[in-house]
């Protein structure tokens, strides 16, 4: 620390920044520079270049599409294999209970959660670029899927024709309802995967930037409330319908509390016990993270205990506790998704595709930054698209990255995608061999697992205080995303949040910060005069800066702020001058009338001596001898047009205005017209307008928009603020000297 301080002191004391050069405006600078010759490619040439394929290019594309071909041959077995095995087993142990639990969120039978924890996870090993994220079921995506499934296949529709209390009829009812909801979930996976593939191949990975961190955190916090609410009925063991769409949270809470008296005490005790065990286990893992070789797999422990207790005490028959039920052994045959459902679920699929990608790529970037490698956002889109679309043929619902499993996979020593492949193989063993053992598992245990896993998301409520301190606009985005997603549903809430986030971008460009800059003495550095005491303005020169681009949405506010900040309003000055000139003209006219009346009156007097005396007095003093008329100044007596023309009061003490264009990234046609109008208006009142630090792309845009002409030339554009200041000072001195000479 001391060395750094000494180095800083040496830098201040010993190093100088001395530059002596001419003052550069763009006209002079461009005259001294020689542009490189650039021949733009035609569309045909671009197509030919993109279609040309050499062996090197083909190999590069193949490695890009299948990253496993690049890293697997170089896999250091001795260094990485043990860590990947431990990590794969630890993650697989979490995949199993979470797959079963999140299937309930997706409104499908639990076995489909296992399918979704196997096929996509295994496929990601070949196509993904992140070494540490754990692909599979995730609460938010599962909740979105469940909302669509319930909307498309509500209980009321299926219940028609099943009014019998016969057990066989009830079984058929649930079977038919679940089959239809599975079709919706599978088709969602297929469609969202196709959308992700299209975005990936079209290199549209940047769409994730529109889901900003405050938006995603507000959205996921609302999703956590949705998920928690949906699990209350399983925890309490009450029978209620599942709701989707606007106000579904309210309806769900009303339905649960209206049947609170029918709570299954056995289910509640089992659920609360599991919640307590899971919270204790997570706290132990957190406190002793450095001492434990691997985290304690409390979720699978709770599942095993819950299954054993349920089977041993026969909770279903004795206490009416709902259990997972039938888990088919083995993999199901491939099936084509229901294509006819696509029009009804397309918007939902777009939302799921983008949210899923955003979750995965944000988590992947965190681990990539931590471990020093890069990920390809477009390839991640392709990988997720393949996982979802191919997995849909094997009855898996949409998946993405799970934050909790990814943290476990990374913290337990996972080095590559091999860990993910091993976790999927563990799920496969359960599907083909021992899945039936989990049939007695109480649903309240799965609800407990889901609820405890929401702990991290509920901690995001602390974001409100954080964003209140740092950024009110980001706080507004968080609140809108949360409230809209909570009450309008996750689909409409997400659309509302994205729309609001876009509006805030427009708002920020419409309401930027405007500053008047001044010089730090004896430097070429210019800062805000209101922020620093040492900063001084040059007499007669105003330097105006707006930290935004100039376009149609803010051009009016730009000119308003310019007039307000500089204190120079050309329209007001011209209006004041016209008013003063009119008043001056009226005074001259009135004085001429008085003069004429006085002369006529004196001409009619009877005494020639008096007449001569009066004429003499008028010629010398401009007043009648009797003194009945007010004195008229000699300058006002002469109402000649020449004197009126040279009357330019009131004046402004500003002779030059410099617009700092360093923050300006682009200018559109409206902005260019506004800028040109500003220059001409200020010129009319004798204020010279210059533009400083204009970037090359903005210069090119101004040229394309025909901004420059005989009155607005490139001589008004300067390389830096200091160039413009020196030029304005020199011009003012020349003008003052010329005025003195005349």
UniProtKB/Swiss-Prot annotation:
- Glycosylation site positions: 163, 166
Q: How is its activity regulated?
A: Sulfate/chloride antiport activity is inhibited by salicylate; this inhibition is reversible.
Looking at the UniProt record, the site noted as Controls the anion transport sits at 404
Q: Which residues bind salicylate?
A: 404
Residues annotated as transmembrane: 77-106, 110-127, 139-152, 169-202, 213-236, 265-288, 298-313, 339-373, 377-394, 403-412, 417-438, 443-470, 472-487, 490-510
The chain positions of domain STAS read 531-728
Which stretches of this protein does UniProt put in the Cytoplasmic compartment?
A: 1-76, 128-138, 203-212, 289-297, 374-376, 413-416, 471, 511-742
Keywords (A to Z) from UniProt = Cell membrane, Glycoprotein, Membrane, Metal-binding, Transmembrane, Transmembrane helix, Zinc
Claim: Cell membrane is one of the keywords in the record: yes
Q: Which family does it belong to?
A: Belongs to the SLC26A/SulP transporter (TC 2.A.53) family.
Protein's job: Electrogenic antiporter that exchanges sulfate or oxalate for chloride ion in a strictly coupled manner with a 1:1 stoichiometry. Adopts a dynamic conformation, which alternates between the exposure of the central binding site to the extra- and intracellular solutions leading to an inward-to-outward conformational transition during the transport cycle.
**Assembly notes:** Homodimer. Interacts (via STAS domain) with CALM; this interaction is calcium-dependent.
Name-wise, this protein is Prestin
Organism in which the protein naturally occurs: Gallus gallus (Chicken)
Origin organism lineage: Eukaryota, Metazoa, Chordata, Craniata, Vertebrata
